[in-house]
């Protein structure tokens, strides 16, 4: 059966989802961490085997026959619930009680004087003396106290609590009659009070010390062996985008049994449009099917047949499984359209409207995978052209790289094309129906059916982009989430936590899921929550839209899932779509990722009445989950995983594993990552140096020390409050390991000698046992559990019993009806009145009428400090304001539309058209008038701190020239220096926008100054990396081609700068695909055409989200002067490395350009990037005023050109072959996956073997591979890595080092890295020229001669 028929017939879905369902159904708890409920006491041993768990079927048989009583004990137990039921085998009474100390069960109670707990019955009221039910309550209470008082440890129990309290509590207990017994029992199952919970994955910290002077080579070797015995080293942590995740089809199109003919019959126009729709959709579908069937599937078969197990992972990185997902849904739509085409346009609309919602999730995942697709494909093609692309057994369709790219990337164009056709089809139907009805209303329901399904399809397509907001819609910009660059990320929910307004530079989105809250907080019973798993936090959003709850069960077709919409917005950096189905949300609670322990259990869903998976989140901090209302603070949260679109793909264990992986991502110090080989329990071992672990802020509750003894466990636990269990492992001989272990509660000790091959098995057994002890012995975690149990019991007894769901549903229907009535009179807009509130101190709001005036006043205040010319500026402000107000509205609207379209096209990329100088005498007023074309909306000149300047380019030129003119007869050297700064900035911008000629030598001076300044800014912006190096070994290894110096300034050739400063194109992304905004920070600051921020200081809290450079204090000229002064006077440790020109000849350089691939110098549409061979606009022939022409950079270059030629070697030909390779390996192909989902790799061996990589290197590069590279770079902190504002210094990369087949300790590694930073020979030849250049730029030399 072909790929198309398997997808279209549904045979594939049936097989896939049935297999997934069976695997979950037969998945048992054996081999996992099992946690029993608290059993009414704190035990010193493993209580798992003491808990007699009944199956869900047994409980379902008991609930209808049981009686539930509730009571409250002030002195000890608090809220108490007791379930009394008859034993079906013996006829005696059984009880199961619930309190904050857990669950206790007593079978076949003795209810007479033979019981030693009979004194409690003597304290019953006379009316209850003969009641066996009341006797069972009293005896159960006293037995609970007896278990609790006998708990070992430092647990204090009120000794005065006796049979009198037990009898009194039984007298006051009331029968729960508000809810049916079976419904109340189901709530107990939903809360997980009667079941054993499971954990399938956990995190273990592994600590070693290779850097100490006392560490011998033998210890280093043993550490190396031990860590590999723990598990397999991971090449990649995780990436959900690289996992096949089809969406189950809840609704599908079926051919009508009794088809009704459409009213418009045999219409040529409508039939033509339907034919076009089928043709377009068929073309997209068959191209995808051809790619899968004739290339990708044979390639996967070929790779799976090989011995290497990592090959399929590498193939999926190049050809992600999302290709299969979009092919599957296209085949389903194509088959539905073929069936519907025989019944006319109404059925065509039904087919499209029914299937189109399933395009959304597949396409947003596919769009996220396309960020680096072209780069990965080009690299894969260059390495495997002969083996794969020219192999007819694999490439059966003879597909080239351009063909594959057009099919995979071009698939995203399908949706907008389909929308255009659907709009034409609908308009044509309306037009023809109007003619047929003779302009009268049509009484049939045909048009309403068309409208319904048309809106369903178009809403999905529109959700991929966004519509421009109406000018009348006012949304406060403070009510949004900001990225570190100040760009609005998205509107999520109200009551946004302040701590999540920062840190977006390193934060990644790991997963988003829609779940049902078992314990809603308020009387409105909003029980749908959105779980967002970040790399550092977990966040719960509550849907608070009554109409959403009212409509969710009344839909005959699929609506877009809220979690999918949020994922598209956060992962693909898209604003939230303006959809009617998008509900209002508010923040429920949140916590740090390592403060939560998550377990999963089985229960019965009250919605589907089927067995479903549930999750329990327990916060182990002292304060519980954080929220905006202290009264609603909770310790635990229970959720049902909805049986919806992700069925077959997402279960509780997968979500728990994502949370544990996020804990790994949250590590602040370098580490090595290993995972156990047991499929039942995944133990992620994070190996860190002792010094790094001591400074680590995110620690696991369990720690394993390698060859490091712990002499005083009590003192150790006092110093490490987050650690609850510690192990030590050391070799006795080559085959035996000595294991020693302790826990904080002093209830566990281990001192055994095991075989080295049994290390993983021993670790698993010890971890499973200690997790059970952790939850059942008296500890800080069990204290938090008692508080969680107390809330659960109170919720069942006092909140759940008071909820009237019938009245609640009636109220919701009334609200939805009122909203629908209001929507007729006015269009529906999202309520953002309470969306994220940002403190006013961080905002400077400017009203529309004063936008230009405020902007100029801000510039005037800075000028006033230097020249005291405020009076002149104020008079000019009045003229500008008047001219702005006199501008006609019509022209304003037209220009606004032009700028809006440009902004939408460029999306933040500055227009690279060469600027034209404008003299103030003639054009100032006109330009200032044009600044009023910004529209009627508010303009904000600062978002938090630092304060960015929101100016048009024309305004910026005017302000610069006005300042120069006003300074006039300034104060001597200060005036000259200010003019030089303004002209230098203008000249640098013009240079960056001009096209660079072939003659690189003529611009060497300018290039070096730009690179020097860029390096200063880069070192200022880079403080470390959070990336896990995926291909490291143990212990750390450093390649000879890399160095580490935090203060190193790197100068590269002009070609490298061209690659480095190029903005991230849409088609070939050379930036980190993870967080577009985060990874662009250093690069944007390097781009001289990018406007600098005006800032005096950073955030008030001391942690800036991004680093900004002030125009006043950090201009290009000042940065150059400062850097060159430091280097010239040898007052810093910075090193300037110049590339050696002896490695390549001029002919070779020409050959390099001629042999470059088509994508090497690819320039996206509407983007001007410097290219080789272009004729630039002459810098010295531009019309400028005499006052600014005197310090032009081109004239400076002419004066000391000969000096630069002699000292900087103008005949120097850069080693482009080597440098381009470095750029490609470290920049372009360094990151393959999305940072929001995964820890990415940075390796040339990402998709290919080391042999293939070595064979692809030039001969010269292979011969000099061991020599020191003049490019001093750090693999763990490249421009594409994430920048963490918490880092104060650059850390050593977690990469292995092999030096003469001997593993070096970290101390020796650090020495080698420092020694590798020795200055090159070329530095001595450039010292004099730099001093000369510094004096020129400081104005100490006179050019008048």
Swiss-Prot record:
Name the residue ranges with Low complexity bias.
Answer: 961-980
Residue stretches of biased makeup (Basic and acidic residues): 854-867, 874-892
Task: Please verify whether the record's keywords include tRNA processing.
Answer: no
Domain of life here? Eukaryota
InterPro entries associated with the record: Bud3_N, DH_dom
UniProt keyword annotations, A-Z: Cell cycle
Bias regions of kind Polar residues — which residues? 910-935
Q: Where is the composition biased (Basic residues)?
A: 893-903
Return the annotated region ranges for Disordered: 843-939, 951-998
User: Is this entry keyworded Cell cycle?
Assistant: yes
GO molecular function list = guanyl-nucleotide exchange factor activity
Identify its protein family: Belongs to the BUD3 family.
Record function comment = Co-assembles with BUD4 at bud sites. BUD4 and BUD3 may cooperate to recognize a spatial landmark (the neck filaments) during mitosis and they subsequently become a landmark for establishing the axial budding pattern in G1.
The protein's name: Bud site selection protein 3
Q: Which organism is it from?
A: Debaryomyces hansenii (strain ATCC 36239 / CBS 767 / BCRC 21394 / JCM 1990 / NBRC 0083 / IGC 2968) (Yeast)
> Upper lineage ranks?
Eukaryota, Fungi, Dikarya, Ascomycota, Saccharomycotina
Q: Which gene encodes it?
A: BUD3
């Amino acid at each position: 059966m072909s790929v198309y028929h398997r997808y279209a017939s549904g045979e594939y879905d049936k097989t896939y989802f049935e297999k997934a369902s069976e695997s979950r159904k037969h998945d048992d708890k054996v081999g996992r961490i099992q946690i029993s409920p608290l059993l009414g006491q704190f035990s010193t041993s493993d209580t798992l085997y003491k808990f007699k768990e009944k199956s869900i079927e047994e409980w379902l048989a008991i609930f209808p026959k049981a009686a539930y009583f509730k009571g409250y004990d002030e002195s000890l137990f608090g809220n108490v619930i007791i379930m009394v039921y008859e034993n079906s085998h013996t006829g005696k009474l059984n009880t199961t009680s619930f309190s904050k100390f857990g669950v206790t069960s007593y079978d076949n109670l003795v209810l007479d004087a033979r019981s030693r707990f009979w004194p409690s019955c003597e304290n019953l009221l006379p009316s209850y003396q003969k009641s066996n039910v009341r006797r069972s309550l009293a005896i159960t209470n006293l037995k609970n106290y007896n278990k609790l008082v006998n708990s070992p440890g430092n647990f204090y129990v009120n000794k005065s609590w006796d049979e009198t309290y037990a009898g009194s509590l039984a007298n006051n207990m009331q029968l729960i009659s508000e809810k049916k017994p079976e419904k109340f029992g189901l709530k107990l199952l939903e809360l997980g009070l009667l079941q054993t919970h499971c954990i399938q994955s956990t995190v273990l910290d592994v600590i070693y010390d290779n850097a100490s002077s006392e560490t011998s080579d033998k210890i280093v070797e043993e550490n190396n062996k031990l860590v590999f015995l723990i598990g397999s080293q991971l090449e990649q942590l995780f990436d959900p985008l690289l996992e096949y995740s089809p969406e189950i089809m809840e609704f599908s199109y079926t051919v009508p049994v009794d088809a009704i003919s459409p009213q418009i019959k045999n219409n040529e126009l409508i039939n033509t449009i339907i034919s076009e729709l089928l043709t377009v959709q068929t073309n997209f579908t068959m191209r995808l099917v051809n790619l899968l069937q004739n290339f990708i599937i044979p390639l996967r078969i070929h790779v799976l047949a090989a011995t290497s197990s990592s090959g399929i992972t590498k193939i999926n990185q190049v050809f992600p499984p999302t290709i299969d997902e979009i092919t599957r849904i296209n085949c389903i739509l194509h088959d539905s359209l073929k069936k519907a085409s025989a019944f006319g346009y109404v059925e065509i609309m039904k087919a499209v409207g029914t299937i189109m919602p399933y395009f959304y999730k597949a396409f947003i995942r596919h769009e996220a995978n396309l960020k680096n697709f072209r780069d990965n494909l080009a690299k894969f093609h260059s390495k495997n052209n002969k083996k794969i692309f020219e192999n007819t057994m694999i490439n059966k369709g003879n597909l080239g790289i351009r063909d594959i790219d057009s099919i995979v990337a071009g698939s995203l164009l399908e949706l907008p094309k389909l929308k255009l056709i659907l709009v034409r089809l609908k308009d044509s139907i309306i037009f023809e129906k109007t003619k047929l009805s003779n302009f009268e209303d049509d009484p049939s329901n045909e048009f309403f059916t068309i409208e319904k399904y048309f809106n369903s399809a178009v809403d999905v397509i529109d959700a991929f982009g966004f519509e421009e907001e109406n000018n009348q819609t006012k949304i406060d910009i403070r009510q949004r989430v900001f990225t570190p660059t100040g760009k609005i990320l998205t509107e999520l929910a109200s009551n946004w936590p302040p701590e999540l307004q920062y840190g977006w530079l390193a934060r990644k989105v790991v997963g988003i899921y829609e779940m049902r809250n078992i314990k809603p907080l308020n009387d409105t019973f909003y029980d749908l929550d959105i779980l967002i798993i970040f790399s550092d936090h977990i966040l719960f959003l509550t849907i608070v839209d009554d109409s959403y709850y009212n409509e969710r069960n009344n839909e005959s077709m699929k609506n877009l899932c809220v979690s999918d919409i949020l994922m598209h917005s956060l992962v693909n950096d898209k604003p939230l779509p303006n959809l009617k189905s998008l509900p209002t949300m508010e923040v429920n609670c949140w916590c740090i990722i390592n403060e939560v322990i998550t377990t999963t259990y089985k229960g019965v869903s009250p919605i589907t009445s089927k067995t479903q998976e549930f999750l329990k989140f327990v916060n182990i901090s002292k304060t519980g989950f954080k929220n905006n209302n202290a009264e609603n603070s909770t310790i635990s949260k229970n959720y049902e995983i909805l049986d919806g679109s992700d069925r077959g793909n997402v279960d509780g264990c997968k979500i728990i594993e994502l949370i544990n992986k996020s804990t790994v991502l949250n590590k602040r110090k370098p580490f090595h990552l290993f995972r156990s080989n047991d499929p039942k329990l995944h133990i992620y071992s994070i190996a860190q140096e002792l010094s790094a672990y001591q400074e680590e802020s995110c620690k696991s509750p369990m720690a394993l020390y390698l060859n490091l003894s712990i002499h005083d466990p009590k003192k150790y636990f006092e110093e490490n409050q987050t650690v609850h269990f510690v192990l030590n492992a050391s070799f006795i001989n080559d085959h035996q390991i000595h294991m020693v272990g302790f826990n904080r509660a002093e209830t566990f000790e281990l001192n055994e000698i095991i075989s080295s091959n049994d290390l993983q098995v021993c670790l698993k057994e010890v971890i499973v046992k200690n997790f059970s002890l952790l939850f059942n012995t008296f500890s800080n975690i069990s204290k938090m559990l008692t508080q969680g149990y107390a809330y659960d019991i109170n919720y069942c007894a006092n909140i759940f019993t008071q909820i009237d769901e019938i009245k609640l549903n009636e109220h919701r229907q009334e609200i939805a009806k009122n909203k629908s009535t209001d929507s007729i009179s006015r269009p529906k807009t999202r309520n953002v009145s309470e969306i994220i509130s940002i403190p006013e101190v961080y905002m400077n709001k400017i009203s529309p009428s004063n936008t230009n005036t405020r902007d100029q006043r801000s510039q005037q205040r800075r000028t006033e400090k230097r020249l005291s010319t405020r009076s002149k500026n104020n008079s000019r402000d009045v003229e500008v304001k008047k001219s702005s107000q006199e501008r006609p509205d019509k022209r304003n609207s037209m220009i606004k539309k032009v700028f809006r379209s440009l902004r939408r096209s460029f999306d933040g990329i500055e227009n690279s058209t060469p600027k034209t100088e404008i003299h103030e005498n003639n054009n100032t007023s006109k330009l200032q008038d044009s600044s009023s074309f910004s529209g009627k909306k508010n303009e904000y000149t600062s978002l938090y701190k630092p304060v960015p300047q929101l100016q048009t380019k024309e305004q910026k030129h005017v302000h610069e020239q006005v300042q120069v003119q006003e300074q006039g007869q300034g104060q001597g050297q200060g005036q000259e220096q200010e003019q030089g700064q303004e002209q230098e900035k203008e000249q640098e911008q013009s240079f960056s926008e001009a096209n660079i000629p072939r003659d690189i030598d003529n611009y060497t001076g300018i290039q070096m100054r730009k690179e020097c300044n860029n390096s200063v800014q880069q070192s200022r912006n880079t403080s470390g990396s959070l990336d896990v190096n995926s291909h490291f070994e143990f212990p750390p290894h450093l390649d000879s081609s890399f160095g580490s110096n935090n203060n190193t300034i790197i100068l590269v050739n002009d070609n490298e700068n061209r690659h480095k400063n190029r903005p991230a194109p849409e088609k070939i992304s050379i930036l980190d695909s993870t967080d577009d905004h985060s990874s662009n920070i250093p690069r944007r600051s390097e781009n001289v055409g990018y406007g600098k921020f005006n800032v005096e200081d950073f955030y008030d809290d001391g942690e800036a989200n991004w680093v900004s450079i002030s125009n006043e204090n950090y201009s290009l000229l000042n940065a150059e002067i400062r850097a060159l002064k430091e280097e010239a006077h040898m007052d810093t440790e910075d090193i300037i490395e110049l590339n050696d020109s002896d490695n390549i000849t001029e002919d070779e350089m020409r050959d390099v350009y001629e042999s470059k691939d088509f994508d090497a110098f690819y320039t996206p549409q509407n983007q001007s990037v410097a290219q080789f061979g272009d004729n630039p606009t002459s810098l010295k022939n531009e019309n400028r005023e005499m006052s600014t022409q005197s310090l032009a950079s081109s004239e400076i270059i002419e004066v000391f050109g000969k000096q630069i030629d002699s000292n900087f070697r103008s005949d120097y030909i850069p080693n482009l072959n080597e440098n381009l390779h470095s750029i490609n390996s470290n920049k372009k192909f360094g990151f393959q996956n999305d940072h929001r989902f995964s820890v990415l790799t940075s390796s040339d061996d990402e998709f290919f073997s080391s042999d293939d990589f070595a064979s692809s290197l030039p001969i010269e590069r292979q011969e000099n591979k061991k020599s020191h590279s003049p490019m001093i770079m750090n693999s763990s902190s490249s421009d594409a890595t994430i920048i963490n504002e918490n880092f104060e210094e650059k850390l050593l990369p977690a990469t292995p080092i092999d030096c003469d087949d001997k593993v070096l300790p970290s101390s020796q590694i650090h020495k080698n890295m420092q020694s590798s930073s020795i200055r090159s020979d070329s530095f001595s030849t450039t010292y004099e020229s730099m001093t000369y250049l510094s004096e020129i730029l400081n104005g100490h030399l006179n050019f008048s001669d």
